[in-house]
């Protein structure tokens, strides 16, 4: 059943108007004043979910702001929409699909009937098949064509079939315990595949081809080249020993030469950017094992249950989504920095870029009408402390408002002492975490700088205005469960914002036209004869120059 969101324009509601007037009153208030007037703010404007301690006190909001934002969420019927998603209602209206990434992490004894099927049973059937396969791979029972054990799995996919597995593998690679490593190929640029395979042995390499339809151009182009690399070294019969598929298209998988017994499926109610906890995560399970992967899924479920049951006033994803909307629609912010103080989360910001920007980068509401306010936050970031020596200057003293999410851990996976002997390198890392959130919020005044004896002409250059907002997310250690909790925390923020904006956060029509046009242009740039003129003079000139530099008739 399709559920069409028919709410009126949210920007024309009393709840929106109340927030606008509230912003007029408090929008310029400094965080210093908020903390002076409310000394307990730093302890009270926090929420704990699972293993995540979330401090949102350094945001330019008051308790009244939060109350008004929750009123806005209720006006948009967020709770009703959330319940529809968890129940399997077709809330992806443009594609008439349920949205059930949350079902991927339901426990085995749960039941969820959607379109006449218990999807939980289907999910665990695939998880069991993945587990049996990875057990064979990790034990050495599964071998390559020459009888050697597999030591490297190469995931070939793009978009959600790549960004999620890459990020999770890097974050959890310390949990590898069976002598298997993973690599990832996504770009159709041949340099990607060539560099990945350069030092690998075909006899000990297994490819996972991840494509729901098994027809994604970039993925199949890379997979075909990888198959040629295997067959040139080991013969045609080796394909069945060195390739498995994550797909739903048995015919094309079989045509490729992969035994369909080694095909792991997923469903149209799982969007690519929400799929790392499905069979798309097979490369991760192969490295960390089925038990650690189950812990990963359990982390998602912890936050799912919180999002589903906690009152909006204390619901972490809802509050963070509402605060993001406050900055986007009332404070003029356009982007959010994601700053993990963990090198293991180096790819987390890139992962969130797809999750958030492909979901909420929309200019049309679910009912087909144009939006009446800005939508979609631009996500970007790098791990600390690297970012401090790159772009934090703009965060501290620039003219743009950039709310930031700081993510850190009390216990490192590995640690080393500092040369000075005062704590460890991890302590040094986290001292920067705490210092940056503090300085962003409170800054340093001209009077304070002058009092240090700074020359008068230098004082203006050293003023740190502060009032730069941030969220601090602190967990004990980066474990599979904690990573699942972090991902789900952001998934449900995306949902919260999308519901209030009235958009469909689960389609991505904006990526389709470019792919179609690329297919049309490929024969134009490769044909032997001179091509017909393109519809615009810029593309025509570019194509002709490219053809000329490739030695083709222009």
UniProtKB/Swiss-Prot annotation:
The lineage's top-level taxon is: Bacteria
Q: Name one GO biological process term.
A: glycolytic process
The catalytic activity, as recorded, is: alpha-D-glucose 6-phosphate = beta-D-fructose 6-phosphate
This entry's Gene Ontology molecular function terms read:
carbohydrate derivative binding; glucose-6-phosphate isomerase activity; monosaccharide binding
Give the pathway annotation: Carbohydrate biosynthesis; gluconeogenesis; Carbohydrate degradation; glycolysis; D-glyceraldehyde 3-phosphate and glycerone phosphate from D-glucose: step 2/4
Residues forming the catalytic site: 358 (proton donor), 389, 515
The EC number of this protein is 5.3.1.9
Where found in the cell?
Answer: Cytoplasm
For this protein, the record's PROSITE patterns field holds:
P_GLUCOSE_ISOMERASE_1, P_GLUCOSE_ISOMERASE_2, P_GLUCOSE_ISOMERASE_3
What is its EC class?
isomerase
Q: Which UniProt keywords apply?
A: Cytoplasm, Gluconeogenesis, Glycolysis, Isomerase
User: Mind telling me which Gene3D superfamilies this protein's record contains?
Assistant: 1.10.1390.10, Glucose-6-phosphate isomerase like protein, domain 1
> Locations of Polar residues compositional bias?
527-540
| Annotated Gene Ontology cellular component terms | cytosol
The UniProt regions of compositional bias labelled Basic and acidic residues, in chain numbering, are 542-554
Recorded hits in NCBIfam families, A to Z, give: PRK00179.1
- Described purpose of this protein according to its UniProt entry: Catalyzes the reversible isomerization of glucose-6-phosphate to fructose-6-phosphate.
- Specify the protein name: Glucose-6-phosphate isomerase
Q: Which organism is it from?
A: Mycobacterium avium (strain 104)
């Amino acid at each position: 059943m399709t559920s069409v969101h028919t709410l009126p324009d949210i920007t024309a509601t009393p709840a929106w108007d109340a927030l606008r007037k509230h912003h007029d009153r408090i929008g310029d208030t400094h965080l210093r004043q908020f903390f002076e007037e409310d000394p307990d703010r730093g302890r009270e404007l926090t929420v704990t979910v699972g293993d995540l301690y979330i401090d949102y006190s350094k945001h330019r909001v008051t308790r009244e702001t939060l109350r008004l934002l929750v009123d806005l969420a209720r006006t948009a019927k967020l709770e009703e929409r959330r319940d529809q998603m968890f129940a399997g209602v077709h809330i992806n209206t443009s594609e008439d699909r349920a949205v059930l990434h949350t079902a991927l992490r339901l426990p085995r004894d749960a039941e969820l009937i959607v379109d006449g099927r218990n999807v939980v049973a289907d999910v665990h059937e695939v998880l069991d098949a993945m587990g049996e396969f990875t057990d064979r791979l990790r034990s050495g029972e599964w071998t390559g064509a020459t009888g050697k054990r597999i030591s490297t799995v190469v995931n070939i996919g793009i978009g959600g079939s790549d960004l999620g597995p890459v990020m999770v593998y890097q974050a959890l690679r310390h949990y590898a315990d069976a002598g298997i490593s993973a690599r990832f190929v996504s770009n159709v640029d041949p340099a990607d595949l060539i560099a990945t395979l350069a030092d690998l042995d075909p006899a000990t390499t297994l490819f996972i081809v991840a494509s729901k339809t098994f027809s994604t151009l970039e993925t199949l182009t890379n997979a075909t080249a990888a198959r040629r690399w295997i067959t040139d070294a080991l013969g045609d019969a080796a394909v069945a020993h060195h390739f498995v598929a994550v797909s739903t298209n048995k015919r094309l998988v079989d045509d490729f030469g992969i035994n369909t017994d080694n095909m792991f499926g997923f469903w149209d109610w799982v969007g690519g950017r929400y799929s790392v906890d499905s069979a798309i995560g097979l490369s991760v399970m192969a490295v960390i094992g089925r038990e650690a992967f189950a812990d990963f899924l359990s982390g998602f479920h912890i936050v799912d249950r919180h999002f589903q049951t906690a009152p909006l006033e204390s619901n972490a994803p809802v509050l963070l989504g509402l605060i993001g909307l406050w900055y986007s629609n009332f404070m003029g912010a356009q982007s959010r920095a994601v700053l993990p103080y963990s090198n293991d989360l180096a790819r987390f910001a890139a992962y969130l870029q797809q999750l958030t920007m492909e979901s909420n980068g929309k200019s049309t509401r679910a009912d087909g009408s144009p939006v009446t306010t800005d939508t979609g936050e631009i996500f970007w970031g790098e791990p600390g402390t690297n970012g401090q020596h790159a772009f934090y200057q703009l965060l501290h003293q620039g003219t743009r408002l950039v709310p930031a999410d700081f993510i850190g851990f009390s216990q490192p996976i590995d640690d080393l002492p500092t040369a000075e002997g005062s704590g460890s390198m991890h302590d040094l890392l986290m001292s920067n975490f705490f210092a940056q959130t503090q300085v962003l919020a409170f800054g340093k005044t001209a009077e304070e700088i002058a009092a240090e004896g700074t020359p008068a002409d230098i004082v203006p250059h050293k003023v740190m205005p502060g009032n730069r907002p941030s969220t601090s997310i602190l967990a004990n250690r980066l474990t599979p469960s904690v990573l699942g909790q972090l991902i789900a925390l952001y998934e449900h923020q995306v949902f919260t914002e999308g519901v209030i904006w009235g958009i469909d956060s689960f389609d991505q029509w904006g990526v389709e036209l470019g792919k179609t046009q690329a297919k049309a242009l490929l024969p134009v740039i490769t044909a032997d004869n001179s091509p017909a003129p393109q519809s615009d003079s810029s593309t025509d000139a570019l194509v002709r120059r490219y053809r000329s530099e490739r030695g083709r008739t222009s």
